[in-house]
C-alpha cells in the first residue's frame, strides 16, 4: 500500500490493427484489497506516470473520443471473486463494467474502461481492463477546477477495518452532511442550497447532487449489489466499494457518487451471503436476520445511508419516483432493451478474447480448465 510498493517498469500498447500505440516508462503496483492475496495469482495492477521514470504524464487517447487524453495513473483491473484464476466458474468479465456503463447511459459521471490482453515480462497474463481512477486528477480533467480543491472519499480496507477515508482533500464536508437530517422540507432543500419552499438561495451551497445520488442507488438496487456501498459480508454495518467526489470551492454541484468494483452483482442463484434474484438492497434497514443496515458512526457513513435518511422526506421520495420512472420506462437506461444492448456490446468485445483467458487461467485452481462455454 503506497509508493514503497511501486516498481519501475516499461509499458507498451500494441494495437492488432497496427494503429499507433505508445511505449513509456512508469511505475507499477498491485491494486485492490482481497485480490492482493497470494491465493489469487493473477492480481490487478495500477500504472503511475511520473517524472521519476520519464514523462510526468501519459499523453494518449486511451478511450478515444469518450475520454480525456492525459493521465497520471490508470488501473488495469480484472475479475477476482468470480474468476477462473480464483477457481470460480461464475466468471463473466461483464459485471463490474456493466454498472459503470449504466451510470454513463444515465448521463452521470462514470469511469471508462477498455479490454486488453496483458503480457507481463513477455508472459501472457490474461484479459484485463483499463479503468480510470475516480480521484482528484480525474475530476479536474473532466470538471475543471483545481486538483487541490477536490475532496475524494473512498473506503480504506487495510487490515480489514473498512473505514471511510479521504484519499484526496478532506472529509469535513461529508461530516457536515452526516450530521444533517432531512425530514422537514427546510432541511431537505438545504441540501441543494434552497430555502424551505424549494427556491434557490443567493449564495446557497449544493451539498449533494441529488439526481446523481438517486441514479447511483438505482444502479445498486437494480443489479442487486451486495458489496457496495455497504457490504453483506459485514452484515451491512460497514461501507465498501464507493467513491464520492466534491469540489469544495464550487457550490453548484455537491458530492457525486461512482460505481466501483461491482463484481458482486447480477446473480440468479442464491449463495452465502447473496440471495440471487431475490436480492433486496432497497429495504436493508428492515431485515430481521441481524444483517439490517446500520451506521454506528461517521467512519461508516456511505451513500446508501444518506439515501435512507432522505427517504423520510416526501419531496425526496417523489423525486426518486420520478427518476425511477425516467430510467425504467419509455426507452430509459434501465429498460430491458437498453440493458441487453449494453450487456451485449461488452460481451461482443471479449467473446473471442476469453478463449485466451481460459488458456492462461482456466486451470489455475482445477485440473480440467474452465472454457468459454462455461
Walk through the language-model features, giving the residues of each:
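Conserved ATP-binding subdomain of kinase catalytic cores across diverse folds
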Residues: 1-164
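Middle-to-C-terminal accessory/interaction subdomains
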Residues: 1-4, 10, 33-36, 40, ...
Amino acid at each position: 500500500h503506497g509508493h514503497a510498493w511501486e516498481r519501475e517498469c516499461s509499458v507498451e500498447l500494441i494495437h492488432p490493427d497496427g494503429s499507433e500505440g505508445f511505449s513509456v516508462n512508469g511505475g507499477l503496483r498491485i491494486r485492490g484489497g482481497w485480490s492482493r492475496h497470494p491465493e489469487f495469482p493473477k492480481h490487478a495492477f495500477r500504472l503511475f506516470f511520473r517524472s521519476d521514470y520519464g514523462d510526468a504524464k501519459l499523453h494518449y487517447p486511451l478511450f478515444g473520443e469518450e475520454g480525456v487524453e492525459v493521465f497520471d495513473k490508470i488501473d488495469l483491473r480484472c475479475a477476482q471473486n468470480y474468476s477462473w484464476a480464483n477457481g470460480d466458474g461464475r466468471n463473466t468479465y461483464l459485471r463490474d463494467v456493466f454498472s459503470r456503463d449504466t451510470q454513463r447511459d444515465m448521463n452521470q459521471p462514470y469511469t471508462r474502461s477498455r479490454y486488453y490482453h496483458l503480457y507481463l515480462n513477455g508472459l501472457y497474463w490474461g484479459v484485463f481492463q483499463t479503468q480510470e481512477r475516480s480521484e482528484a486528477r480525474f475530476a479536474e480533467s473532466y470538471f475543471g477546477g483545481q486538483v487541490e480543491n477536490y475532496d475524494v472519499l473512498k473506503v480504506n480496507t487495510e487490515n480489514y477495518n473498512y473505514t471511510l477515508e479521504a484519499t484526496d482533500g478532506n472529509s469535513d464536508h461529508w461530516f457536515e452532511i452526516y450530521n444533517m437530517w432531512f425530514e422537514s422540507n427546510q432541511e431537505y432543500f438545504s441540501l441543494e442550497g434552497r430555502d424551505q419552499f424549494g427556491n434557490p438561495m443567493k449564495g446557497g451551497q449544493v451539498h449533494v447532487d441529488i439526481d446523481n445520488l438517486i441514479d447511483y442507488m438505482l444502479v445498486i438496487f437494480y443489479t442487486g449489489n451486495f458489496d457496495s456501498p455497504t457490504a453483506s459480508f459485514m452484515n451491512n454495518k460497514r461501507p465498501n466499494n464507493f467513491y464520492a467526489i466534491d469540489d469544495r470551492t464550487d457550490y453548484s454541484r455537491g458530492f457525486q457518487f461512482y460505481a466501483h468494483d461491482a463484481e458482486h452483482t447480477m446473480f440468479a442463484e442464491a449463495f452465502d451471503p447473496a440471495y440471487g434474484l431475490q436480492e433486496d438492497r432497497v429495504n436493508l434497514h428492515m431485515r430481521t436476520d441481524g444483517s439490517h443496515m446500520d451506521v454506528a458512526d461517521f467512519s461508516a457513513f456511505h451513500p446508501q445511508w444518506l439515501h435512507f435518511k432522505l427517504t423520510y422526506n416526501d419531496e425526496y421520495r417523489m423525486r426518486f419516483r420520478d427518476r425511477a420512472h425516467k430510467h425504467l420506462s419509455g426507452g430509459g437506461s434501465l429498460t430491458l432493451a437498453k440493458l441487453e444492448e449494453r450487456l451485449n456490446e461488452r460481451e461482443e468485445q471479449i467473446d473471442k478474447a476469453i478463449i485466451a483467458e481460459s488458456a492462461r487461467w482456466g486451470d489455475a485452481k482445477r485440473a480440467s480448465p474452465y472454457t468459454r462455454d462455461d
